[in-house]
Structures are given as C-alpha cells and as structure tokens.
Amino acid sequence: MSQLFNNSRSDTLFLGGEKISGDDIRNQNVLATMAVANVVKSSLGPVGLDKMLVDDIGDFTVTNDGATILSLLDVQHPAGKILVELAQQQDREIGDGTTSVVIIASELLKRANELVKNKIHPTTIITGFRVALREAIRFINEVLSTSVDTLGKETLINIAKTSMSSKIIGADSDFFSNMVVDALLAVKTQNSKGEIKYPVKAVNVLKAHGKSATESLLVPGYALNCTVASQAMPKRIAGGNVKIACLDLNLQKARMAMGVQINIDDPEQLEQIRKREAGIVLERVKKIIDAGAQVVLTTKGIDDLCLKEFVEAKIMGVRRCKKEDLRRIARATGATLVSSMSNLEGEETFESSYLGLCDEVVQAKFSDDECILIKGTSKHSSSSIILRGANDYSLDEMERSLHDSLSVVKRTLESGNVVPGGGCVEAALNIYLDNFATTVGSREQLAIAEFAAALLIIPKTLAVNAAKDSSELVAKLRSYHAASQMAKPEDVKRRSYRNYGLDLIRGKIVDEIHAGVLEPTISKVKSLKSALEACVAILRIDTMITVDPEPPKEDPHDH
C-alpha cells in the first residue's frame, strides 16, 4: 500500500486501483473499437470474405455474418464489448446490417477523437453529431425512401437477394430469395390490435445432409425433425380436422421417487404396486385417447406399454420433440401445451379443448432423413424450409443467411419502405450533410462535416473488398449525387441520379433501383441511430478506473 502514496502521479485515487484519464483513455477506446471493426471490415459487401473462428476445444465456425463473428470473439476491452452488443442488437431488431453498423460506429469515434485533439469539447461534438443524425434521417425518409406498394413482389425478392449477396448462398440467390419471400408470405398473421405481422419464428428451418444447396425445399406446414414412435403406427392421418395433442409430460411407467421406502409383508402387495405403477400411466393414455386425439406429440418418452394402446387406437405418437417446436405447433394449431394433467382438485383430466386442429399430418422422407409434416394448421399458417448441403458448417452458415434474409423481408413488409443499396444512401448523405454543415454557424459545423465524411467508409470498404479502386469509384459516386442534389426540379434525369450506387461485380456506378439492390429504410435508419448511440456512449468516457482484485486471504490452517 505504501507505494500507492509514493506514486508520483497526483491523480491516483486513494484506493488500490489504476486511473487512466484524458487523451490516454480516449485513444485506448478508439483503438479498441477500431480493432473490433477491422475484424469484420473485410466481410462487408457482396464480395466480402469469410472468417473462420476456432474455439478452445477446436470446434470451428465459418461465417461472414457480423453479429456471429463478434459474438464468438472474446473481446477484453470494455469499449470493444459495447460494439459487440451493438451488432447483436442490430441482429435482433433488423437481422441484417450488423457489419456496417459496427464499421460506422468505429469510424465516427475515430473522427470524433481527432476533433477532441484539436481542442473541441466532446459535448460540442455530440451535439453536432445529433443534429447531423436528425437531418440524415429526415433526408432518407423524404428523398431516398420509396414505398414498396409501388414496386410489388419483385421488390421483396430483390431485397432478399441483396441481403444474401454477401453470404454463402449468394450464388443461388435467385432460388433462395423466392423461397424466403414465399415462406414469409405464407405465415402472414394479424395480431389482436389488427396489425399485420410476419413472424420469422413461424418459418421452421431444418437441415438435412446431402445433395446440393439448390435442392433445398420449401414445405407448406410445420416440419418436425422426428419420426413416429413405432413402425406399426399410421404414417399419414388426413381428412381435415386432425386433432393434435401437445404434451410436455412423460408417458412412461410411473416409478417411485428415489428414497421412498415401503415395508410390505406379503409378496402379492408387491405385485399390486407394480400393477398400479403401470395403471397410472395407462389411465393417462386412456384419457388422451378418449378426448379424441389422433396425433400425440410429446417432449418426453413414450414406453412400450403406452405405444401398444396408441397403435391399437390407430393414433400417431411422436416422442422426444423439442419443446420450442411444440410451442410453435401449439400456437399454430390452437392446441394447449399440457405439462400436467392434474386439475385443481388433484384429479387427472384431459379435455378435448386442449387439442389443436390441422388438415393433415404425414411422415415424409427427405434423402436419408424422415420428418413429420403438419399441414394446414387452423390458427396460424406455417411453412418450413428444408436445407440441403454438403456438411454441417455450410448448413449452419446457410441457416444464418436465411435468417438474415427472412428478418429483412419481414421488416420491409411491416414498414413498407425501401432505399437503394450499394453505398447509395451513404454517398447521398455525405453530399447533403456537407452542404448542410456550411449553413450551421457554430462549432457544431465541424462535427457535422466529420459525420458526413465518416459515412463514406461504407462505399469505400465495399469497393476495397471488391478489389476495385475505391478512391476513383467513390469520387465518381459523389459527383453523381452532387449533380442530383443541385439539379433543378424539372431536370428529371439528373434528379434520378439520387438512386445511383456501386455495382461491385463490374466496378461501375449504376441505378440501384433498376439493378434491384434494395434495403429496408428502417435498417438504414436504425443502424445510423444505433451507431451514433454507441459512439456517444464511448465518447463521453474521460476516465477509466480499474480496481485491483483483492489479494487472496491467507488460510490460518495452512502450515
């Protein structure tokens, strides 16, 4: 402790710990965020590269999804962790744009730090950034955004394609984008407030080895990765109004709990106990059969004793289903997921109102795997995608890519507006905010100009990843947008330049709306808002105090 008071630095606190403040901590934070952003930078865009992440036991993941990469990293620095959480939040809320949100946040921080070094107070910078963000969002909504109604189903397919372009299924995006749009349109529902929703979770994705990616299937109905419990059971039950019971309980012989002791003096009593053990579960099965169930799905086991009853009653029984699957099936068919058959009086009952309805339940075969399909569910419609691929790693990555595309199409359908992709929004905002900055008379002008410059990191990174000359392409792109914003209202051709962005395959500037490179407006707005919030949170930090861990206490009995 004595060395603490002898420490020459006057700003050391009177606690066992280390204090870093001023420029040191800002530089540290910027370096940490740049390090995190540089990991994902090269995976941005249609020609972005993948990352292989190996964990401590040797399992590896190959992916190009920003949120997945950052979740698997073990980030030590607190500022870096803020960016990881930022990517995860973007993934949860929008599903796509995780990489770009991290890159924008780190670039904003880097430029803000330069301004601080030039003696501009962080509060002034934050105010300037907030003004810039407000103007940017207004410009996106008023000028760049287009309503989907005017563009039709083709737009949704293009949005799904744009989301897939950077992923493993990018080469087959024509095939998969149609599949994604059809799957989502099939699960359209209306909630209690009368709003139309497209729940991504209602689209079940199953993975089966073998064949190629383009032999994946879209199946109407809910696909369960299970098979019937006995070969003697019917493999198909149809005819409309098929009654389904969803159970979260064990249909196995009841065994006495561990540690229960029963003293008996007559061997016949032992036989009675055995019979009663079997009787308890048989009574349950009878009640389920009497309620009229034709299909029984359970998360636990069904033993041979019960299977015999089900087979005789021509009931299809499926055991060891995932609870999450049963929850969704219960929601789609209107069934109740029963976890206990006891009622309030303590007696066991099974009401027919617990059953759900559908049109058909069938066991279908896909390559070597079999699965149960539940078609024509009564409450909400559902659809399933069965992915085919060479190995686990490619199937996992395909599933992540599909999830991103489904989320993006869902957001577009619910919000109804799209903007051109390919760096178009960022270039347009760059020109607009640069001009806007000159109209602001205070010191915030510098912050707004830096905000504008930071946005160019997206088109620059896209061009660099595509092995193109970024300086030339971005300069050309800016000249198009400058022309569009200075054009007179009657000059339609020059006004249409506002939709121009990068075509990274051919290295040209093209009209993105005609090229079909589109993104939901909400994705762009949300990523700018989130990136700014993360940047502000880190920029406001001017001191970091690391408290030393307490030394382990000595054990008095340790000689």
Curated annotation (Swiss-Prot):
UniProt keyword terms in alphabetical order: Acetylation, ATP-binding, Chaperone, Cytoplasm, Nucleotide-binding
Domain of life per record: Eukaryota
GO MF terms held by the record: ATP binding; ATP hydrolysis activity; ATP-dependent protein folding chaperone; unfolded protein binding
Gene3D superfamilies: GroEL (3.50.7.10), GroEL-like equatorial domain (1.10.560.10), TCP-1-like chaperonin intermediate domain (3.30.260.10)
This protein's name: T-complex protein 1 subunit alpha
One Pfam family named in its UniProt record: Cpn60_TCP1
Record InterPro entries: Chap_CCT_alpha, Chaperone_TCP-1, Chaperonin_TCP-1_CS, Cpn60/GroEL/TCP-1, GroEL-like_apical_dom_sf, GROEL-like_equatorial_sf, TCP-1-like_intermed_sf, TCP-1_chaperonin
GO cellular component labels: chaperonin-containing T-complex; plasma membrane
Family in the record: Belongs to the TCP-1 chaperonin family.
Cellular localisation: Cytoplasm
Function noted in UniProt: Molecular chaperone; assists the folding of proteins upon ATP hydrolysis. Known to play a role, in vitro, in the folding of actin and tubulin. In yeast may play a role in mitotic spindle formation.
PROSITE patterns: TCP1_1 (PS00750), TCP1_2 (PS00751), TCP1_3 (PS00995)
NCBIfam families according to UniProt: chap_CCT_alpha, thermosome_alpha, thermosome_beta
UniProt organism field: Saccharomyces cerevisiae (strain ATCC 204508 / S288c) (Baker's yeast)
Sites bearing N-acetylserine, chain numbering: 2
GO annotation (BP), single: protein folding
Main localisation: cytoplasm
Subunit structure comment from the entry: Heterooligomeric complex of about 850 to 900 kDa that forms two stacked rings, 12 to 16 nm in diameter.
